[in-house]
Amino acid sequence: MYYIGVDLGGTNIAVGLVNENGKILKKGSVPTKADREPDEIIKDMAALCLDLIKEVGIAVGDVEYAGIATPGTVDHDSGYVVYANNLPFLNYPIAAKLTEFSGIKKVLVENDANAAAKGEAEMGASKGCNDSLMITLGTGLGGGIIIDKKVYSGFNYAGGELGHTVIEVGGRQCSCGRKGCWEAYSSATGLINMTKDKLA
Protein backbone atom coordinates (compact mmCIF):
# COMPACT_ATOMS: atom_id res chain seq x y z
CA MET A 1 0.00 0.00 0.00
CA TYR A 2 0.95 3.62 -0.56
CA TYR A 3 0.12 6.85 1.20
CA ILE A 4 0.18 10.52 0.25
CA GLY A 5 1.02 13.36 2.61
CA VAL A 6 0.06 16.91 1.69
CA ASP A 7 1.43 20.02 3.41
CA LEU A 8 -0.88 22.83 2.34
CA GLY A 9 0.67 26.16 3.25
CA GLY A 10 -0.09 29.77 2.53
CA THR A 11 2.89 29.85 0.16
CA ASN A 12 3.35 26.32 -1.23
CA ILE A 13 1.59 22.97 -1.58
CA ALA A 14 4.07 20.15 -0.91
CA VAL A 15 3.16 16.52 -1.58
CA GLY A 16 5.01 13.30 -0.79
CA LEU A 17 4.18 9.74 -1.84
CA VAL A 18 5.41 7.08 0.59
CA ASN A 19 5.30 3.31 0.84
CA GLU A 20 4.01 1.30 3.81
CA ASN A 21 7.41 1.65 5.52
CA GLY A 22 7.25 5.45 5.31
CA LYS A 23 9.97 5.69 2.66
CA ILE A 24 9.46 8.75 0.46
CA LEU A 25 9.25 7.53 -3.12
CA LYS A 26 8.51 10.85 -4.81
CA LYS A 27 7.79 14.40 -3.75
CA GLY A 28 6.95 17.69 -5.38
CA SER A 29 5.55 21.13 -4.74
CA VAL A 30 3.70 23.95 -6.46
CA PRO A 31 2.89 27.51 -5.36
CA THR A 32 -0.40 27.78 -3.46
CA LYS A 33 -1.45 31.10 -5.02
CA ALA A 34 -3.78 31.62 -2.07
CA ASP A 35 -5.64 34.59 -3.57
CA ARG A 36 -7.95 32.42 -5.71
CA GLU A 37 -10.98 30.19 -5.28
CA PRO A 38 -10.59 27.20 -2.93
CA ASP A 39 -11.46 24.66 -5.64
CA GLU A 40 -8.63 25.96 -7.82
CA ILE A 41 -6.13 25.39 -5.01
CA ILE A 42 -7.39 21.84 -4.44
CA LYS A 43 -7.35 21.09 -8.18
CA ASP A 44 -3.63 21.95 -8.19
CA MET A 45 -3.16 19.74 -5.11
CA ALA A 46 -4.98 16.87 -6.83
CA ALA A 47 -2.97 17.31 -10.04
CA LEU A 48 0.28 17.14 -8.06
CA CYS A 49 -0.90 13.97 -6.27
CA LEU A 50 -1.83 12.37 -9.60
CA ASP A 51 1.51 13.37 -11.15
CA LEU A 52 3.41 11.63 -8.34
CA ILE A 53 1.21 8.53 -8.60
CA LYS A 54 1.91 8.35 -12.33
CA GLU A 55 5.66 8.94 -11.90
CA VAL A 56 5.93 6.11 -9.36
CA GLY A 57 3.96 3.83 -11.70
CA ILE A 58 1.04 2.91 -9.48
CA ALA A 59 -2.73 3.32 -9.75
CA VAL A 60 -4.86 5.76 -7.76
CA GLY A 61 -6.52 2.75 -6.13
CA ASP A 62 -3.15 1.70 -4.70
CA VAL A 63 -3.18 4.78 -2.45
CA GLU A 64 -4.77 3.71 0.85
CA TYR A 65 -4.99 7.21 2.35
CA ALA A 66 -4.08 10.79 1.64
CA GLY A 67 -3.52 13.08 4.60
CA ILE A 68 -3.76 16.86 4.34
CA ALA A 69 -2.09 19.13 6.89
CA THR A 70 -3.54 22.61 6.51
CA PRO A 71 -3.45 25.86 8.48
CA GLY A 72 -6.57 26.99 10.26
CA THR A 73 -9.27 25.42 12.37
CA VAL A 74 -10.02 21.94 11.08
CA ASP A 75 -12.89 19.58 11.86
CA HIS A 76 -10.99 16.37 11.15
CA ASP A 77 -14.11 14.25 11.74
CA SER A 78 -16.01 15.87 8.85
CA GLY A 79 -12.97 16.73 6.71
CA TYR A 80 -13.81 20.44 6.71
CA VAL A 81 -11.58 23.46 7.13
CA VAL A 82 -13.78 25.59 9.36
CA TYR A 83 -11.68 28.73 8.90
CA ALA A 84 -8.21 29.62 7.67
CA ASN A 85 -7.14 33.25 7.61
CA ASN A 86 -4.16 32.68 5.26
CA LEU A 87 -6.22 30.66 2.78
CA PRO A 88 -9.69 31.30 1.29
CA PHE A 89 -11.37 28.46 3.24
CA LEU A 90 -14.56 28.94 5.25
CA ASN A 91 -16.51 25.76 6.10
CA TYR A 92 -14.81 24.16 3.11
CA PRO A 93 -15.07 20.35 2.54
CA ILE A 94 -11.39 19.89 1.70
CA ALA A 95 -11.34 16.08 2.12
CA ALA A 96 -14.33 15.54 -0.17
CA LYS A 97 -12.91 17.99 -2.72
CA LEU A 98 -9.55 16.18 -2.92
CA THR A 99 -11.46 12.91 -3.42
CA GLU A 100 -13.59 14.53 -6.13
CA PHE A 101 -10.63 15.98 -8.04
CA SER A 102 -8.15 13.08 -7.61
CA GLY A 103 -10.15 9.89 -7.13
CA ILE A 104 -8.30 9.11 -3.87
CA LYS A 105 -11.06 7.55 -1.78
CA LYS A 106 -9.84 8.07 1.80
CA VAL A 107 -8.64 11.54 2.76
CA LEU A 108 -7.83 12.63 6.31
CA VAL A 109 -7.40 16.27 7.34
CA GLU A 110 -5.65 17.86 10.32
CA ASN A 111 -4.41 21.29 11.30
CA ASP A 112 -0.79 21.56 10.12
CA ALA A 113 0.68 22.38 13.52
CA ASN A 114 -1.31 19.56 15.15
CA ALA A 115 -0.04 17.15 12.50
CA ALA A 116 3.55 18.30 13.08
CA ALA A 117 3.16 17.97 16.86
CA LYS A 118 1.71 14.47 16.47
CA GLY A 119 4.58 13.51 14.15
CA GLU A 120 7.15 14.72 16.67
CA ALA A 121 5.32 12.89 19.48
CA GLU A 122 5.25 9.64 17.49
CA MET A 123 8.68 9.69 15.86
CA GLY A 124 10.61 12.85 16.69
CA ALA A 125 11.83 15.22 19.38
CA SER A 126 9.02 14.55 21.86
CA LYS A 127 8.83 10.78 21.36
CA GLY A 128 8.22 9.13 24.72
CA CYS A 129 6.67 12.26 26.26
CA ASN A 130 3.04 12.24 27.34
CA ASP A 131 2.62 15.99 26.90
CA SER A 132 4.27 18.44 24.52
CA LEU A 133 3.82 21.75 22.74
CA MET A 134 5.04 22.60 19.27
CA ILE A 135 5.16 26.05 17.70
CA THR A 136 5.29 26.27 13.91
CA LEU A 137 6.49 29.29 11.96
CA GLY A 138 5.82 29.98 8.30
CA THR A 139 3.35 32.17 6.44
CA GLY A 140 1.48 32.12 9.76
CA LEU A 141 2.25 31.01 13.31
CA GLY A 142 0.62 27.89 14.70
CA GLY A 143 0.77 25.58 17.65
CA GLY A 144 0.14 21.91 18.30
CA ILE A 145 -0.65 20.69 21.80
CA ILE A 146 -0.28 17.05 22.86
CA ILE A 147 -1.87 16.00 26.18
CA ASP A 148 -1.70 12.35 27.28
CA LYS A 149 -0.27 11.49 23.83
CA LYS A 150 -3.36 12.89 22.05
CA VAL A 151 -3.82 16.06 20.04
CA TYR A 152 -5.72 18.67 22.03
CA SER A 153 -8.18 20.29 19.62
CA GLY A 154 -9.88 22.55 22.13
CA PHE A 155 -13.08 24.53 21.73
CA ASN A 156 -14.19 24.85 18.09
CA TYR A 157 -11.03 22.98 16.98
CA ALA A 158 -8.89 26.04 17.80
CA GLY A 159 -6.91 24.71 20.78
CA GLY A 160 -3.55 25.17 19.07
CA GLU A 161 -4.21 28.47 17.32
CA LEU A 162 -1.48 30.16 19.35
CA GLY A 163 -0.75 32.67 16.60
CA HIS A 164 -4.05 34.38 17.32
CA THR A 165 -3.33 34.93 20.98
CA VAL A 166 -3.25 38.70 21.50
CA ILE A 167 0.16 39.69 22.86
CA GLU A 168 -0.23 43.46 22.43
CA VAL A 169 -3.65 45.01 22.92
CA GLY A 170 -4.36 47.37 20.02
CA GLY A 171 -1.13 46.29 18.29
CA ARG A 172 -0.31 45.40 14.70
CA GLN A 173 -3.13 44.37 12.37
CA CYS A 174 -3.34 40.59 11.92
CA SER A 175 -4.66 38.86 8.81
CA CYS A 176 -7.45 37.37 10.97
CA GLY A 177 -8.91 40.86 11.46
CA ARG A 178 -7.85 41.37 15.08
CA LYS A 179 -5.02 43.54 16.34
CA GLY A 180 -1.98 42.48 18.33
CA CYS A 181 -1.95 38.75 17.54
CA TRP A 182 1.36 36.92 18.02
CA GLU A 183 1.27 35.95 14.32
CA ALA A 184 1.39 39.63 13.31
CA TYR A 185 4.82 39.88 14.97
CA SER A 186 6.50 36.49 14.63
CA SER A 187 5.34 34.77 11.42
CA ALA A 188 7.23 35.22 8.16
CA THR A 189 4.39 37.45 6.96
CA GLY A 190 4.55 39.53 10.13
CA LEU A 191 8.32 39.95 9.90
CA ILE A 192 8.07 41.00 6.24
CA ASN A 193 5.34 43.54 7.06
CA MET A 194 7.34 45.01 9.97
CA THR A 195 10.44 45.27 7.77
CA LYS A 196 8.46 47.05 5.04
CA ASP A 197 7.09 49.49 7.63
CA LYS A 198 10.60 50.26 8.92
CA LEU A 199 11.93 50.82 5.39
CA ALA A 200 9.04 53.08 4.34
Label for each model-derived stretch:
Residues 5, 67, 117, 143-144:
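Small-residue (primarily alanine) positions within well-ordered alpha-helices
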Residues 3-7, 62-67, 132-136, 175:
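Short glycine-aspartate micro-motif
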Residues 11, 71-74, 138-140:
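Short glycine-rich anion-binding loops that position phosphate/pyrophosphate groups of nucleotides
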Residues 12-14, 115-117, 140-142:
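Short glycine/serine/threonine-rich phosphate/pyrophosphate-binding segments
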Residues 16-19, 29, 37-40, 108-110, ...:
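Glycine/GP-enriched mid-protein hinge/lid loop-to-helix segment characteristic of carbohydrate kinases
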Residues 2-47, 80-83, 157:
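Short glycine-rich, Thr/Ser-proximal phosphate-binding strand/loop in the N-terminal lobe
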Residues 34, 38-46, 50, 61-66, ...:
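Glycine-rich phosphate-binding loop and adjoining helix at the ATP-binding site
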